[in-house]
């Protein structure tokens, strides 16, 4: 202990101040309101008015223990007490010496302790030259401090400080006048060496001057920037300027968290800098500014992208084969091609290569095949419907400058998957459209091109997203409607129509059990016969897929449920005899096509987006002036086929046995029934020639034939598409003789062998061969 201190010990009541520090040689006012403090105050007044005053560590604590305040404080004397209207006592105290608690005294009413008092004797302290110099610097700096705050200290106080002969009193008084935090205050109280204490106060004064200069500069800049409408945000703006001056970020709720989360994503340098720049903009922006909401939404969207999150994808061909077989009946060629595709992916370890495009009519299982691929490769599955999409922004997103802007659906689906390598189904890619808002097909080019999609940039996100690990699969009903540039990037796998036997197996294995489960039934309560299922297939649906078939099975089961619940029936059996009670009258009758030989009526074969159909073409010839009329809502290509057919007949009139100048003396009317349904395509050419020649010659056409093929002016028959669907349509209607172009002979290998055996195929390269066979 220094020679200028005299140590004594006293038993004193304790008052702990909240947010206030008291130093020796100073007078201070404060209010006392807590019961423990009031009791300590009264005990002091009853003794000699001496009290130990210290500071509470946490000013928010109401009930304190001996561990909740600093044990170093001051010995003070109570000079005055005034009772306040709110019940508190206002106290005036004078602090004398530093003191610290030695041990506590048990007391239930107030805090009390044995305190070691360090009484200072100014006559025994002899400052060093360094300390004297520093004291002068403190006084000079304190005068500068008064000028900076532009609130001059009272002359009596300033004069008292300048004339102060006691260094201890001087520096303790100055410590009371400057802003010190708890750490600095307790350090100053605990420092007993006068030379060290002088040096500490000098540092504190210099620090206070620097702080006030910065504050003054900040206030000046802030006042210039704040307009009349921004005055209410004055405090937030000040805080922003303070943080900017310190080189720190302004923490608007969670900008620090944003920055940390972005850094953890390990983005490319340019991408990370771009997002951090937006976070910095947010940190320096008033939270009430509408643009801060836009930036916050943008950052949230970026963070929602699964940048480095990928499923642990594995390709096990045995598992893949089992998944495909369990989920799909038939479609053997499709399954084989998908297994080949997956095998190549596993061998190369790369997803670069053609994108699979599953083309086929609705309801044949294209979407479920894509789901099975996801299951087989242990990936998440997401899908995006492209039907009717006209706006490029649906793919690429809107720029965030627009109100309500959001990322495109590619990004949102990745966010939904929470993985960066899902199986991504682009459904109905042939239904894309375009208008003044852009061409979404062009936007998809970048998505589907393996050489480009590693740098896919959404207009909203603005930084590249790597799509190279995404397994894209597309579906379409018609290959012809897919834009050429997109088609060039895809490998087409045709998912053809189901045969009746395949539909039966699908219904029996999958649809029936699923509908029973959904309606709370089991096999012990419901049975439908084989013949009844075939009747539903042939007389209530007539579709390429099985969606309508499942709906009808569900309808039958629901009515069976009503019967069981209402009539207390234990089991319902559905057969051909009672099927109409469940489904009503047959929707597709067996006599839709000619069942006898007729003049001018021919069974054509057509392919639609719902599969193959019989397209009956009728031709009639009557006296007239050579007019030609086409009805049945025919498209331009089909009309041109009719014109080509007439030209062929005119040029071969004599060989065909047609007399007279029919093109001058007769009017020709070609009609295709179901006039409300649009029809188009070149494959009805041979059918029109046959119907016209029959009508012009009066020769009947054999009703058990069906035909398809494009006609040329010379009578050549050209190849067409959709052979499998067309042949299945003929089989459904009971037609077992089919004319096909010779070039399509290879296509019948795709047809079920059981059906091939039931149909006699005629392959022709010239329409004359058809006429010779079918005209009677």
From Swiss-Prot:
InterPro entries, per database record: AAA+_ATPase, ATPase_AAA_core, Lon_bac, Lon_bac/euk-typ, Lon_lid, Lon_proteolytic, Lon_Prtase, Lon_prtase_N
Domain of life according to the entry: Bacteria
Domain Lon proteolytic stretches: 596-776
Disulfide-bonded cysteines: none
Localization of this protein: Cytoplasm
Catalytic site: 683, 726
Ranges of residues in domain Lon N-terminal: 12-209
Protein purpose: ATP-dependent serine protease that mediates the selective degradation of mutant and abnormal proteins as well as certain short-lived regulatory proteins. Required for cellular homeostasis and for survival from DNA damage and developmental changes induced by stress. Degrades polypeptides processively to yield small peptide fragments that are 5 to 10 amino acids long. Binds to DNA in a double-stranded, site-specific manner.
PANTHER family registered for this protein in UniProt: ATP DEPENDENT LON PROTEASE FAMILY MEMBER
Identification of the protein by name: Lon protease
Organism, as annotated: Finegoldia magna (strain ATCC 29328 / DSM 20472 / WAL 2508)
């Amino acid at each position: 202990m220094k020679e200028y201190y005299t140590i004594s010990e006293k038993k004193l009541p304790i008052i702990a101040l909240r947010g206030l520090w008291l130093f020796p040689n100073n007078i201070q006012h404060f209010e006392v309101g807590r019961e423990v403090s009031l009791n300590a105050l009264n005990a002091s007044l009853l003794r000699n008015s001496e009290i130990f005053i210290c500071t509470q560590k946490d000013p928010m604590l109401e009930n304190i223990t001996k561990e909740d305040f600093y044990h170093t404080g001051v010995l003070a004397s109570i000079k005055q007490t005034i009772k306040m209207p709110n019940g508190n006592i206002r106290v005036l105290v004078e602090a004398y010496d530093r003191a610290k608690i030695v041990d506590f005294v048990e007391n239930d009413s107030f805090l009390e302790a044995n305190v070691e008092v360090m009484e200072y004797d100014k006559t025994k302290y002899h400052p060093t030259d360094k300390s004297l110099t520093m004291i002068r610097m403190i006084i000079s700096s304190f005068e500068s401090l008064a000028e900076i705050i532009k609130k001059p200290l009272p002359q009596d106080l300033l004069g008292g400080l300048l004339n102060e002969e006691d260094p201890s009193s001087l520096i303790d008084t100055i410590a009371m006048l400057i802003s010190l935090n708890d750490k600095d205050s307790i350090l100053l109280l605990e420092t007993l060496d006068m030379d060290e204490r002088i040096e500490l106060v000098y540092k504190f004064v210099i620090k206070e001057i620097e702080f006030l200069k910065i504050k003054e500069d900040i206030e000046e800049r802030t006042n210039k920037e704040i307009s009349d409408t921004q005055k209410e945000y004055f405090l937030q703006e000040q805080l922003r300027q303070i943080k900017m001056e310190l080189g720190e970020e302004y923490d608007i709720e969670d900008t620090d968290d944003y920055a940390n989360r972005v850094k953890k994503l390990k983005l490319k340098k340019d991408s990370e800098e771009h997002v951090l720049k937006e976070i910095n903009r947010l940190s320096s922006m008033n939270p009430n500014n509408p643009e801060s909401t836009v930036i916050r939404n943008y950052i949230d969207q970026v963070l929602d992208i699964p940048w480095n999150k990928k499923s642990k994808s594995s390709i096990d061909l045995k598992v893949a084969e089992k998944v495909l077989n369990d989920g799909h009946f038939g479609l053997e060629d499709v399954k084989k091609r998908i297994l080949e595709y997956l095998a190549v992916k596993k061998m190369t370890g790369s997803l670069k290569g053609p994108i699979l495009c599953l083309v086929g009519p609705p309801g044949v299982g294209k979407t479920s095949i894509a789901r099975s691929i996801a299951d087989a490769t242990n990936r998440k599955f997401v899908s995006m419907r492209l039907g009717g999409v006209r706006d490029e922004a649906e793919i690429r997103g809107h720029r965030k400058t627009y109100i309500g802007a959001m990322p495109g659906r590619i990004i949102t689906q990745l966010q939904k998957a929470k993985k960066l390598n899902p199986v991504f189904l682009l459904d109905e890619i042939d239904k894309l459209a375009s208008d003044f808002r852009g061409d979404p097909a062009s936007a998809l080019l970048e998505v589907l091109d393996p050489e480009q999609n590693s740098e896919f940039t959404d207009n909203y996100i603005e930084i590249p997203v790597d799509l190279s690990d995404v397994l894209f699969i597309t579906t379409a009903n018609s290959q012809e409607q897919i834009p050429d540039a997109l088609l060039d990037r895809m490998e087409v796998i045709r998912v053809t129509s189901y045969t009746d036997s395949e539909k039966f197996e699908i219904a029996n294995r999958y649809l029936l059990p699923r509908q029973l489960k959904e309606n709370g039934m089991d096999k012990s309560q419901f049975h439908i016969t084989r013949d009844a299922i075939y009747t539903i297939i042939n007389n209530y649906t007539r579709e390429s897929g099985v969606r309508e078939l499942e709906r009808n099975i569900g309808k039958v089961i629901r009515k069976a449920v009503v019967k069981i619940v209402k009539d207390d029936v234990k089991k319902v059996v559905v057969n051909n005899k009672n099927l109409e009670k469940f489904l009503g009258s047959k929707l597709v009758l067996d006599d839709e096509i000619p069942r006898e030989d007729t003049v001018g009526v021919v069974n054509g074969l057509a392919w639609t987006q719902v599969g193959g159909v019989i397209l009956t073409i009728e031709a009639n010839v009557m006296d007239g002036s050579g007019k030609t009329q086409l009805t049945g809502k025919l498209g331009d290509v089909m009309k041109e086929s009719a014109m080509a057919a007439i030209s062929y007949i005119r040029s071969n009139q004599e060989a065909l046995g047609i007399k007279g100048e029919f093109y001058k003396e007769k009017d020709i009317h070609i009609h295709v029934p179901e006039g409300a349904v649009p029809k188009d395509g070149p494959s009805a050419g041979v059918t029109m020639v046959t119907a016209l020649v029959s009508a012009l010659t009066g020769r009947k056409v054999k009703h058990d034939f069906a035909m398809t093929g494009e006609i040329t002016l010379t009578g050549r028959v050209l190849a067409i598409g959709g052979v499998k669907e067309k042949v299945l349509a003929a089989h459904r209607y009971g037609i077992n003789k089919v004319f096909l172009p010779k070039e399509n002979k290879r296509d019948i290998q795709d047809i079920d062998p059981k059906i091939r055996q039931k149909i006699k195929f005629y392959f022709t390269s010239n329409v004359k061969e058809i006429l010779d066979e079918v005209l009677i």
